[in-house]
Amino acid sequence: MAKNRVEKITERLVMPIIQNENFELVDLEYKKEGSNWYLRIYIDKPGGITLDDCQKVSEQLGEELDREDPISENYFLEVSSPGLDRPLKKDSDFIRFAGEIVEVKLYEALNGNKVIEGELVGLEENMIKINVANVGLLELPKEKVALTRLAVKF
């Protein structure tokens, strides 16, 4: 089954479950790693997701997937938090996490760099704005960005 079709069906099935629990769907992916397929659902809520939250969504979604049976391959279902390095996907993410340090991966290098780290200023007219040390404010067209995620600092 086509990856996009599985993801669309899964999103349709999981949305009522997470909305009922007042959770946010951060991301979902259906991908093959080695010889195994994985259906991964990343959820969040204010204050953070717990293991019990993940289990509840996993059980309910598992029942829906078993009932509709949209995936022909054997797969592993994983429900988890997005982690400390959560991806920023929705426009609202860029507003919510303004002021945080982010890592931006570009499709093509900019001044020799495909990865840029800086303070997220926000998103305006499809331009991701980040303040980069020793460079200043950069405005990056969203379509040229492969991935934006929160940077993890230790």
Curated annotation (Swiss-Prot):
The keyword Cytoplasm applies. It holds the Pfam family DUF150_C. Its main location: cytoplasm. Keywords: Cytoplasm, Ribosome biogenesis. Coiled coil: none annotated. It is found in: Cytoplasm. InterPro entries: Ribosome_maturation_RimP, RimP_C, RimP_C_sf, RimP_N, RimP_N_sf. GO terms for cellular component: cytosol. GO terms for biological process: ribosomal small subunit assembly; translation. Belongs to the RimP family. Required for maturation of 30S ribosomal subunits. This is Ribosome maturation factor RimP. It comes from Alkaliphilus oremlandii (strain OhILAs). The gene is rimP.
